[in-house]
């Protein structure tokens, strides 16, 4: 599911930070808590083993890890920044191309004449578009595949008839199954155009373009799934970050605490700085892992099934409510009818119009005469 925290940060406040920080679902704590626990076990295991060694072996142990003590994660930060940027761009590309039905539904419902046959054709076009979306999503999203494991489930849900399902299954769909319902939708529109049910050729073309754009968006999402980021790139990042913290389990130890090192006593028992690094770097990496495939089943992955339901019901609603109510006078015809707010509204911005930064600066009176002159060659503009 998508975890919403927008209301918690609607107004900046001191406690708003804690509301977001102590969330569990979709949080960085949920992403890293297992690996942080495993790392702490490794850290204290190394410390316990060191305590069992004699002095000579302790010296050998310390000499072997001295090479890693000053190793800093700056290169990891550099690598992670590029990797996460790439992942977020792909995530945004998937989100903007998942297929939202509104534009196509508005075009289909607005540019055609009224009539029962036209209404049925409009509803059929919407159903075909959503059926095409289902065929795409069930090939790239495990959530959609669990809901529609076969064509019979699509028929049962009402997105296809048995006859339509049979035709699709009997078609060679080795490369793309979603093209068939899209083609049917275009054919329905074409038949309605030939029957004279479109107001003009230009609006028919506009409707056809919206249907085509819907298919284009679905095609882009499918291609993102087909061609992921080259495997070597995430392998390097995943391996490098985890290897760094394995090294830290040895190199960031405070093995012996002298009297002069009393200020480090807390680090002797708990590696605060290294744990902070772990939360930041490993959390950053886990964010990238979660966004790498936003159509999976993580807490913050996209709600594919909700989008399918929203598209079919919203599209049908737009078709059924395309006829507006009778036109009547509105209250705003009275120029003295001002903005109305409930009595309990205390918004400080009420009555404060947004305006340009120098709009209220008066350099001359309303009717003042301004002396002007022509800009000549010897008097260039400033």
UniProtKB/Swiss-Prot annotation:
Per UniProt, which keywords does this protein have? Membrane, Repeat, Transmembrane, Transmembrane helix
Mode of membrane association: Multi-pass membrane protein
- List, alphabetically, the Pfam families matched: Bestrophin
State its location(s).
Answer: Membrane
| GO CC annotation terms, alphabetical | membrane
Annotated membrane-spanning segments are 29-49, 68-88, 231-251, 265-285
Q: Which GO terms describe its molecular function?
A: chloride channel activity
Q: Name the PANTHER family for this protein.
A: BESTROPHIN, BESTROPHIN HOMOLOG-RELATED
To which protein family does this belong? Belongs to the anion channel-forming bestrophin (TC 1.A.46) family. Calcium-sensitive chloride channel subfamily.
The protein's name is Bestrophin-6
- What organism does the UniProt record list as the source? Caenorhabditis elegans
Lineage runs: Eukaryota, Metazoa, Ecdysozoa, Nematoda, Chromadorea
């Amino acid at each position: 599911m998508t975890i919403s925290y927008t209301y918690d940060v609607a107004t900046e406040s001191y406690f708003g930070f804690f509301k977001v920080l102590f969330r569990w679902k979709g949080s960085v704590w949920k992403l890293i808590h297992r690996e942080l626990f495993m790392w702490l076990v490794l850290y204290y295991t190394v410390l316990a083993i060191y305590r069992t060694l004699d002095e000579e072996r302790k010296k050998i142990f310390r000499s072997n890890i001295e090479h890693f003590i000053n190793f800093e994660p700056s290169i990891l930060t550099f690598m992670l920044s590029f990797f996460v940027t790439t992942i977020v761009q792909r995530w945004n590309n998937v989100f903007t191309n998942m297929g939202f039905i509104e534009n196509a539904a508005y075009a289909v419902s607005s540019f055609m004449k009224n009539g029962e046959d036209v209404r049925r054709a409009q509803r059929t076009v919407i159903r075909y578009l959503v059926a095409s979306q289902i065929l795409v999503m069930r090939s790239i999203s495990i959530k959609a595949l669990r809901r529609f494991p076969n064509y019979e489930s699509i028929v049962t849900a009402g997105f296809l008839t048995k006859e339509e399902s049979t035709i699709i299954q009997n078609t060679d769909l080795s490369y793309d199954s979603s093209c068939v319902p899209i083609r049917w939708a275009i054919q329905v529109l074409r038949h309605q155009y030939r029957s004279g049910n479109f107001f003009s050729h230009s609006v028919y073309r506009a409707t056809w373009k919206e249907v085509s754009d819907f298919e284009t968006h679905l095609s882009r999402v499918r291609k993102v799934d087909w061609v992921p980021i080259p495997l070597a790139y995430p392998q390097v990042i995943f391996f490098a970050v985890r290897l760094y913290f394995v090294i830290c389990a040895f190199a960031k130890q405070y093995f012996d605490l002298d009297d002069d090192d009393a200020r480090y006593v807390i680090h002797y028992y708990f590696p605060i700085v290294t744990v902070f690094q772990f939360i930041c770097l490993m959390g950053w990496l886990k964010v990238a892992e979660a966004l790498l495939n936003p159509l999976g089943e993580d807490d913050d992955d996209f709600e594919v099934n909700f989008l399918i339901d929203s598209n079919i019901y919203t599209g049908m609603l737009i078709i059924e409510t395309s006829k507006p109510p009778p036109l009547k006078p509105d209250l705003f015809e009275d120029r003295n009818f001002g903005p109305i707010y409930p009595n309990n509204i205390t918004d400080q911005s009420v009555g404060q119009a947004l305006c340009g930064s120098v709009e209220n600066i008066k350099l001359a009176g309303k009717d003042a005469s301004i002396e002007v002159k022509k800009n000549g060659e010897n008097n260039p503009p400033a």
